[in-house]
Amino acid sequence: DGTRIAIGEETALGSQNVKINARGSGQVRIFDYSESGWVQVGSNIDGEGAGDLFGWPVSLSSDGTRLVVGADDNDDKATNAGHVRVYDYTASGWSQICSDIDGEAEADKSGFSASLAGDGTRIAIGAKYNDDGGNNSGHVRVYEASSCSQVGADLDGATADDNFGYSVSFSDDGSILAVGSPNFDGNGSNAGRVYIYEFSNGSWSQVGSGIDGGTAGDTFGQAVSINSAGDRVAVGAPGNGAGHV
């Protein structure tokens, strides 16, 4: 009835502007709920450098033992290319399990969105300003979480300024992926669109037609969430005159 929420065993909280390593480096903390309330699990996880905004997106596996964190303004590959890190929780605490997943090019902001499949096997990473399909068309890449190796080809935005990858959401087993493209112009300027993809036979294929925003300016797809089975999706359209989902 909407009065109770299950978050697995842990909740991850991101703090973009924390100044532990440098101003705006960011930080993530993880908490367990017990009879005494919310208790931190493991140490703080700090961003790498000034302005990284580490902790902008965070995503936990269903059992709370695997964590994905984005830092969309990280500069390791190029200025504001962004990166994502993957952590596992063991008796010794939170440990990074594979190399950083860096954005492709300057100003891509890879890691602006990130979704970890509920079973912890795959990660979807959005880079809303990537230019592969046109200036700021955006793209999404999917990775095996345990190895940080890419799964299938890039998923690119259709046209310039679509901001494809602004939001991403995985089904529980990582086989079905929802991607928001809030500035797509199908039903008017910035009406928005959401795409659904399924992984089969080594590649990603679109499922049905895109789901379009109703009117110009809706920015339909700024937020997207797909259920564990991958057969129902909720989409936010904050630019709609009434504001709707």
Predicted regions: what they are:
Residues 1-245:
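Conserved beta-strand/short-helix segments
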